[in-house]
Amino acid sequence: MIIIISGLHGTGKSTIGKLLADYYKLEYYSTGQAFRDLAQKKNMSLEEFTLFVEEHPEIDYELDKLVLKYAKKGNIVIDSQLGAHLLKSSVNVKILLTCPLKTRIKRIVERDTSNFEEKLKETLLREKSELDRFKKLYNIDLRNEQIINELYDIIIDTESLSIQQVLKKIILELEKKF
């Protein structure tokens, strides 16, 4: 089984992805974590690394190759913005988590114990950079509602749901499909 979980920063995709992987006894891979790890290796903040990656598309290509590599192995939950676009029909289920910006930033601040304004600025920069890079590199528009509705099997707004409620909704949907 291959499950792709996508969503903007702070929607809950990493938390839910890890819980799904545990529940179904699957591996878990996160491109977001790989991105953060690369930033740390280069001794850069996420903002600095985001700007660096804009000038070095090979980093995005390398991260996307890893998604394809892990997907080929199977039995995995992949947390990736582009995973559903890159893998399309070779995935069992594609999940998109959504949530309004203010709630997402509050979650990120709680997770990282940081400042709201700082995380808002960083997140907006990262998301704009990702949208621009993915459009330029792959001609993918992550905001296209028609493509979103056609591509994803499950779309959940996580704003007013607990982690357990989101997990339960996804598991119920997966049980209907399999």
Region roles according to the model:
Residues 16:
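Hydrophobic positions on the alpha1 helix immediately C-terminal to the Walker A/P-loop
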